[in-house]
């Protein structure tokens, strides 16, 4: 006899409940009376009664033939209607289950939500009452921690509770690659083509990677489950328990807080009316990307407020798009130039000119005083008297760390940097860790810090996961961050990069290979932190040389590629690699060593910027 496996087994399991006993097996008791045949065939009670009435009249006499015919006819019609209804219902359930076999968990969830919107009901998700590892937040840090926990403990059961309706995904492409896609369905697929031509999804893993939350406690080899659209509203540190916004309670053994941050708004917008707020995007999530992409096809002008990484990336992306659509893109910020808080002034000004060439009207030294509505347009009034009319506003002015759980959990908030205050091992309590944007940690090289970048989320999440499984390691691996202003200009940075610090820049003429596009082609990934290898810079030697006065870059030069060193007490504490790629391990080693250097021109040679 053949055995059905794989898909056949799935079909069998799905369709077994639909099988009906339309044929009666031979009874084991041969002396059973035939009068039970109707019960065996599951004929409705009213039809059985009709049959009995048809076989005998009052007081056991024979019925009139016309009455008999009427009863038999009605019985036949009723039986036919019943059979028709039964077959149609079975066919409907059959089709639904056949279609359900090929649906992903994401699609099933989407259809369930759509059914609820149309008046249907969504079965409640069973929340496990206890998990060994609980991760609060569904971003990069939480996912990195989950992978790290499972790597050290392959049987671990990990539950991620995420307020976001999406499965864990990477944020950088939301302001970079997705905007350069020529796929008209990019907002649905969320697939992007990297500069090297390879396709990639912004999701870290497909739905099949995860297990269901209700099955998590019973799976023999453990796994990672995600509760989407759920928020932890109460944390009991002593009782190892959290409460969700739906009233559910979960106890845990180890807990990670990776709640990230919320985009900051402007007080001028907060004071404005409802119409201004409805025409303002606080850019952060997938939903914000989808909304802004749609808006960019419908309006005539968009103003980006903010001159940092996110604001400049979005301005460049929208500016490049405007070359085909004709939309006006304006960027305004209080600094003198783009990324003025990070880059030295000469490089910030050069970057601003680059952004202008992308089709953006850049307005530096702009402080927003008020926002209102005038003639169907949003009217932005600046402190110096200038006015800007626009159809839509995008604010990119930083994050406010999500620290609401500090109150119920009795956790400390850092008064200088914000975020949960943790030690070098990212611990807030003996069984509580914090990672990502919400963590204010002690860097054993650079002091107390709070960092809001993708690679830091990866590094801190991974470290927290290791320490949750007993590693007891301090935060020593310096995370990096990067920013691309289109395919031609990009930079990578590490450490303390603050334009208020003394800087030394060493530059060289760029070649056709010195751009983000070429870097991606060589590394195979647009998420450049993924291409790093520490072993490349395990040993570096800086040759001795006579002290030299570093050359000060001249305003107006073409800064094709170079290295900018940030100094504190003559020690390099931060490095920006300008159109220099795949050299981050060297920069990390220099900062880790923490030595004074007499001639930074010699140090710059380690990055091979003068090679053709």
Curated annotation (Swiss-Prot):
Residues 133-482 are annotated as: FAD-dependent oxidoreductase. There is a cross-link at residue 254 (Glycyl lysine isopeptide (Lys-Gly) (interchain with G-Cter in ubiquitin)). It comes from the Eukaryota. SMART domains: AIF_C. Its EC number is 1.6.99.-. FAD binds at residues 137-141, 163-164, 171, 176, 232, 284, 437, 453-454, 482. It holds the Pfam family Pyr_redox_2. Residues 1-53 form a transit peptide. Under normal conditions, a 54-residue N-terminal segment is first proteolytically removed during or just after translocation into the mitochondrial intermembrane space (IMS) by the mitochondrial processing peptidase (MPP) to form the inner-membrane-anchored mature form (AIFmit). During apoptosis, it is further proteolytically processed at amino-acid position 101 leading to the generation of the mature form, which is confined to the mitochondrial IMS in a soluble form (AIFsol). The modification Phosphoserine is found at residues 115, 267, 370, 523, 529. Its cofactor is FAD. Residues 512-551 are annotated as: Disordered. NAD(+) 1 binds at residues 307-310, 335, 341, 398, 452-453, 482. Residues 512-528 have a biased composition (Polar residues). Keywords: Acetylation, Apoptosis, Cytoplasm, DNA-binding, FAD, Flavoprotein, Isopeptide bond, Membrane, Mitochondrion, Mitochondrion inner membrane, NAD, Nucleus, Oxidoreductase, Phosphoprotein, Transit peptide, Ubl conjugation. One of its GO terms (cellular component) is cytoplasm. Monomer (oxidized form). Homodimer (reduced form). Upon reduction with NADH, undergoes dimerization and forms tight, long-lived FADH2-NAD charge transfer complexes (CTC) resistant to oxidation. Also dimerizes with isoform 3 preventing its release from mitochondria. Interacts with XIAP/BIRC4. Interacts (via N-terminus) with EIF3G (via C-terminus). Interacts with PRELID1. Interacts with CHCHD4; the interaction increases in presence of NADH. This is Apoptosis-inducing factor 1, mitochondrial. It comes from Rattus norvegicus. The lineage of its organism: Eukaryota, Metazoa, Chordata, Craniata, Vertebrata.
